[in-house]
Regions:
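C-terminal motif of bacterial Sec signal peptides marking the signal peptidase cleavage site
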Residues: 22-25
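N-terminal leader/presequence-like segments
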Residues: 11-13, 20, 67-68, 113
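Bacterial N-terminal signal peptides that target proteins for export
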Residues: 1-15
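Residue-level signal for mature regions of secreted extracellular proteins and peptides
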Residues: 19-20, 300
Length: 447
């Protein structure tokens, strides 16, 4: 392993080091606020969080039309910033990157391809949302200190002028958030809670925080995420249930007119992540024993002893249209569902049962935290699911617009998949996108 990435050949490693050195020298005399741009028409950013004598942490620019790295040094930030998860503004003007290694929010201008500021956070954050106009960011920090209150809060950061924290809204143990389409509400989800907190951003006063009481809606079961309806009058809340210390996994309606919990559908297969496509909701999770076996609809032959499930829900009727137990997929804690071309659905998890292949020349199963489901086949008697031969946590998935290509991060390595075959087409051992260090997330910033 080389900095968390499979070893390269000596010649290729030397070539990579020379390339990195050349790129670094090209950018060494300019500041992080350089206005020089690559001029690429379709760009993708990859966050890389390792700094050493041969590589530097930052955002790497990829030419997504040619699948090659841009001839530019990684976009870095001051203070040893080590970027992880990224968040794209609705208008695509900014990309925010969070470093949980040093509790910092980095702000990057997509037009100038430069860092325009960093803001220290009071703790790690796994969820950030931006206002529709990209003027404000909200970071969920479960450990944020609050005088006279339990820790946890939504940290409000201005992104205009000099970036900085303007307020903190106390929400104990807040972990995840989702914003309504019109920006009028933020739903906040806290650890070990059976409630959803509704936060109206317009009532947050700079320097003071929330100036009206927050609305807390009870009646859920360890809620962790939600999806707003098109008119923002209701939301579908994902109840994590037993995977998060609760009782029953389900999808439940939140009435935002009366602020009450509504109807729900139990999901035996588990719910930790979801994706809406038209009137269909796909959810993934890992059920509790004895229901987490690797036998059932769509099951593949595997040495893994525990598996997760993919369930399909019709939203208008709030009923499961897949087999009630769900389709068999990889286990772990599922965090990513991403639709791709040709009806392919990429499913990513962390802390799954990795099956490592035997040493060569022997052959055997290899399996990690990625599954691909052909949604066109899920309503047939022969559902098609694929477990690509790779290992590690899946931390980023990005389908490329108008292409049958998906960029993906698995085990800290950059991968490229072809949706016509569901196979890896280029990996770090063979592609022109060598990433020294550890890749974390991937985001397309042009559409």
């Amino acid at each position: 392993m080389l900095l968390g990435v499979p070893c390269l050949s000596r010649f290729k490693l030397l070539l990579c080091l020379m390339t990195v050195a050349f790129l670094a020298s090209c950018g060494s005399s300019s500041s992080n606020n350089s206005t020089h741009t690559t001029g690429l028409r379709l760009r993708v950013l990859v966050s890389q969080d390792v700094s050493s004598n041969i590589t530097s942490a930052g955002l790497i620019i990829i030419d997504a039309l040619k699948d090659v790295r841009a001839v530019a040094a990684p976009i870095s930030a001051s203070g040893g910033f080590q970027p992880g998860n990224m968040y794209l503004a609705d208008n695509r003007s900014l990309t925010l990157a969070v470093s949980n290694i040093n509790a910092t929010l980095g702000i990057f201008n997509n037009k100038t391809e430069a860092n325009v500021g960093t803001v220290g956070l009071p703790g790690a954050s796994d969820s950030v949302v931006l206002s529709p106009d990209a003027s404000t960011a909200y970071a969920a920090v479960p450990t944020a200190a609050n005088a006279g209150s339990p820790p946890g809060g939504i940290v409000v950061v201005t992104l205009t002028g000099t970036p900085g924290i303007t307020a903190t809204v106390p929400v104990p143990s807040v972990r995840y958030m989702v914003r309504s389409g019109d920006g009028s509400r933020i739903l906040a989800f806290s650890d070990d809670s059976n409630s959803v907190t509704i936060v109206p951003p317009q009532s947050i006063i700079s320097g003071q925080g929330q100036n009206t009481p927050l609305t807390v809606v009870t009646g859920f079961d360890r809620p962790i995420f939600g999806f707003f309806s098109a008119d923002n009058s209701q939301a579908w809340v994902l109840n994590c249930g037993p995977e998060c210390g609760g009782t029953e996994a389900s999808v439940q309606v939140l009435d935002l007119i009366h602020n009450t919990a509504g109807a729900k559908v139990a999901v035996p297969g588990g719910v930790t992540i979801g994706l809406i496509s038209n009137q269909t909701l796909y959810v993934a999770g890992t059920p509790q024993p004895p229901d987490n076996t690797c036998l059932g609809p769509g099951a593949l032959t595997t040495a893994a002893t525990t598996c997760g499930r993919l369930s399909v829900i019709d939203l208008p009727s709030l009923t499961i249209t897949s087999p009630p137990s769900g389709f068999v997929i990889q286990d772990g804690y599922h965090t990513l569902l991403s639709p791709a071309s040709n009806g392919q659905l990429f499913i990513g998890s962390r802390n799954c049962s990795n099956i490592v292949p035997p040493a060569l020349p022997a052959t055997g199963e290899q399996r990690g935290c990625l599954f691909i489901a052909d949604t066109n086949s899920l309503s047939t008697s022969n559902p098609r699911l694929v477990a690509p031969p790779d290992n590690g946590d899946v931390t980023g998935i990005q389908p490329i617009t108008n292409r049958t290509i998906v960029y993906l991060i698995e085990g800290g390595a950059f991968r490229i998949y072809d949706t016509t075959t569901d196979q890896m087409t280029l990996g770090e051992a063979t592609s022109a996108i060598d990433i020294l260090g550890q890749a974390v997330d991937v985001k397309q910033i042009d559409f």
